Amino acid sequence: MKMSKEGKQSKRTLLITGLIIAMFFSALDGTIVGTAMPKIVGDLGGLSMMTWLTTAYLLTSTTIVPIAGKLADLLGRRIVYVSGLIIFMAASALCGMANNMTELIIFRGLQGIGGGIMMPMAMIVIGDLFTGKQRAKFQGVFGAIYGLASVIGPQIGGWIVDSLNWKWVFYINLPVGIIAVIFIARGLQGRQQTGPINFDIAGIFTMIVGVVSLLLALSFGGKDYAWDSWQILGLFALALIGIVSFIIVESKAKEPILPMYLFKNRTFTFLNLIGFFMSIGMFGAITFVPFFMQGIVGVSASESGTIMTPMMISMIITSIIGGQLVYKIGIKPQIITGMLVMAGGFLLLTTLDLDTSKLVATSFMAIIGLGMGLVMPILTLALQESFSKEELGVVTSSSQFFRSIGGTFGITMLGAVMNARSGNLLTDKLVPYLDSLPAQASSFAAQLKGMIDTNPQGLLQSLFSPDAVKQIPAAFSSHIVPILKTSLMDSLHSVFYTGLIFIAVGAVFTLFLKPIKLSNKKAEDQQEKEKAAKAVESPSH
């Protein structure tokens, strides 16, 4: 029995509403949890384990993304999406009920599985529902939703923690998630299986070994363990074994998680490389500009966080505009434009100095956001326009996967640049002054020299704490603090120049893209009608 035109439109509206709700709250989760961290540690303890709340989620969510995309192609969108939502909600409830930090970390890892499944699914479903111009428009809208969640997340998190308690940061996902499940389950097409499903178990296992080992090495290297320690070298070795094994397994699998033949497609390879390098720059700016604001300008941690707001607002604007603009100028020109705008923003960041105001710094971040909004949604659109519906899940999730890896790699690589550069600067500028101090200050000088040798970045971060600065003897602070500030500024310049290079490399890869043709208007109108009908006419079972 076929639905009326009004019934189909109603189900599609229901589905899109469910997608928006699910995507908004999964994006919101990361920012509001960060706001609640101090309260969580105050209640559960485990300060030394706090970073694992983020690391556990990162590990599981990043690893599951390509697996979710393949499962969506094999099993259908509805069962995979709804399963991800249910896992996310169940884990959220468990996080709220956690009695200690260890339990919370485990449940955050479980929550990451649900979040990682949800992450690519909205874009996959948009790719199913729409073609051409409509697809571009909705990719832009959903990119804007992600940006909006990043802007208002800290405010919502702060209100929840202050008005209720930190547990409601997790519990709030339950009523909202239930609504999203109902809307998506009712609006999204199911699939009737006609034959056996070949799960690539070996591919899943080798991917988990390779990706988790790599992310752990990048997360802990240079911070918890030295880069040449046996722990980090062992993780890199295990990552190499896992990735090589994954490539071998995937080349022979009947239903590979990430088919190796896709990398022979120039469009697939270069679009994911562009996304990888763009994410290095994006996460570099988000991570290291607050260092400048706190250490040089002297704003508080909460104030430095607001510097992200203009960047996200500008990203929201260009995400929406870009979804329409791409149909006029084309995919390749828009990506090049966005990457060049981002590069311009990074070039401006290299001009930050001791006299830079908060307004100037935020305006530079806003320029980077303009470029991000032009590029991010269009990368997914370009992949979807270049492949068949049968490959939509894999190619869409691959885009999110390589961006996540790029972000993690970028934070680690740029952090290493900052550490190395700051160590050299402090050795050149601060050590000669410490050597000139009188004998009675020898223990103080030795302490600072030890920090320069082992943790120069940590010494510079003492600028973020007024209490730490006050511990420097008054007789020496007038010399030491300016040296620390100029060293921090110069090391951040090196970080921003490195980020600029990565963005420039991404822009160069854009030149190698073949022209990607968007669906023409007449064909698009007909395809829209056919897709909408198929998407909402769900089998009864």
Curated annotation (Swiss-Prot):
Answer whether the UniProt record assigns the keyword Cell division to this protein: no
Which keywords fit this entry according to its UniProt record? Answer: Cell membrane, Membrane, Transmembrane, Transmembrane helix, Transport
What's a single GO CC term here?
plasma membrane
Query: What happens when the protein's gene is inactivated?
Result: Disruption of the gene completely abolishes the multidrug resistance observed in the mdtR mutant.
| Compartments, record wording | Cell membrane
The UniProt gene name for this protein comes to mdtP
* Organism this protein belongs to: Bacillus subtilis (strain 168)
Classify the protein's membrane topology as the record does: Multi-pass membrane protein
Q: Could you tell me which InterPro entries the record lists for this protein? A: EmrB-like, MFS, MFS_dom, MFS_trans_sf, Sugar_transporter_CS
Principal cellular location given in the protein's record: membrane
Annotated family: Belongs to the major facilitator superfamily. EmrB family.
Q: What does this protein do?
A: Multidrug efflux transporter. Contributes to resistance to several antibiotics, including fusidic acid, novobiocin, streptomycin and actinomycin, possibly by pumping these structurally unrelated antibiotics out of cells.
PANTHER family documented for this protein: COMD, MAJOR FACILITATOR SUPERFAMILY
PROSITE patterns with a match to the protein in the record: MFS, SUGAR_TRANSPORT_1
> Where are the membrane-spanning stretches?
14-34, 40-60, 79-99, 112-132, 141-161, 168-188, 201-221, 229-249, 273-293, 307-327, 329-349, 359-379, 401-420, 492-512
Under the heading CDD domains, the entry gives:
MFS_Azr1_MDR_like (cd17502)
Per its record, what triggers expression of this gene product?
Answer: Part of the mdtRP (yusOP) operon. Expression is repressed by the HTH-type transcriptional repressor MdtR. Induced by fusidic acid. The mdtRP expression is decreased during stationary phase, even in mdtR mutants.
GO: which molecular function terms?
transmembrane transporter activity
Q: Which GO terms describe its biological process?
A: transmembrane transport
> Does the entry feature the keyword Membrane, yes or no?
yes
* Name under which the protein is recorded: Multidrug transporter protein MdtP
